Amino acid sequence: IESEGDTKVAKVWIEKKGLKRAAEKEDRTTEAGYVFSYVHFNGKVGSLVKLVCETDFVAKTDDFQNLGREIAMHVAGVKPENVEELLKQDYLRDSSKTIEQIVKLVSGKTGENIRVTSIASM
């Protein structure tokens, strides 16, 4: 209704709604999750990313798993110094979004607080 049939406006509205839902969950405890790794095909670049959420159920979803792999690949390519720097960076696959925004989008979609807690690149 708010988009009046305009798919671009609808997409922006959905993303804003997801970001708002994610912000409401930021104080929730995150004890589940995984460590994701990425090794470039040449074996000379790699990274580790610890991504956490509230439950094992969400940690096992395709959305969460894909997010972890994408962030690990980003860390290997861009080599941020720390999590704070990572979250502010433009996402390699879509420079119109930051890493923080893609994390919040998945958080809004899953209904759980999702956080990157540590990173390493080599």
What are these regions (language model features)?
Residues 1-122:
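N-terminal assembly/interaction segments in proteins that build large macromolecular machines
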